């Protein structure tokens, strides 16, 4: 298990992010998805393959998190191998290339987010199949190297159910055995994580956390 650095989230996930498994982390803007992925990679002590499709990866934020935790910021930055595909086609190429990039020196793969370029495409016919293929490649990497893969996802409003749901819910749900939803709460900095699916933990469990300079911390 790869620790998130917080007791509450580790407990919620059954010890942390599971190796050999795709974990979907989804939620609205600024709910803590990227911070959670950065912190998990930072504390792993090993290399992280980070596919940033939204421009959300912030070296400054990573440095801040490292410094406030007494870690070497330059060493931390050097461990994050960043990929920035500009469209869905390039995303396909980048994810395919990870099969050669990721080796035993890597502790984690993050795709942030898997659906941003998919949503930007005008003609989505056939793209669901391609999205499924990309997820299959990520699952192959997770299993081959026995490491976690965090797949960050966006949300959309479903007018039929009048609820916010993850984008491409069925496609991601088929491949992702663990699903974690993050939400903002009225109190500034406070967030809640809801376990929507897990291989052995009960669904619906919740954990509260704060977003601070250090990253994500337990609520005291």
UniProtKB/Swiss-Prot annotation:
The keyword Hydrolase does not apply. PROSITE patterns: RECA_2. InterPro entries: DNA_recomb/repair_Rad51_C (IPR013632), DNA_repair_and_recomb_RadB (IPR011939), P-loop_NTPase (IPR027417), RecA_ATP-bd (IPR020588). ATP binds at residues 27-34. CDD domains: archRadB. GO terms for molecular function: ATP binding; ATP-dependent DNA damage sensor activity; damaged DNA binding. The keyword Cytoplasm does not apply. It comes from the Archaea. GO terms for biological process: DNA recombination; DNA repair. SUPFAM superfamilies: P-loop containing nucleoside triphosphate hydrolases. Pfam families: Rad51 (PF08423). Keywords: ATP-binding, DNA damage, DNA recombination, DNA-binding, Nucleotide-binding. Belongs to the eukaryotic RecA-like protein family. RadB subfamily. Involved in DNA repair and in homologous recombination. May regulate the cleavage reactions of the branch-structured DNA. Has a very weak ATPase activity that is not stimulated by DNA. Binds DNA but does not promote DNA strands exchange. HAMAP family: RadB (MF_00350). This is DNA repair and recombination protein RadB.
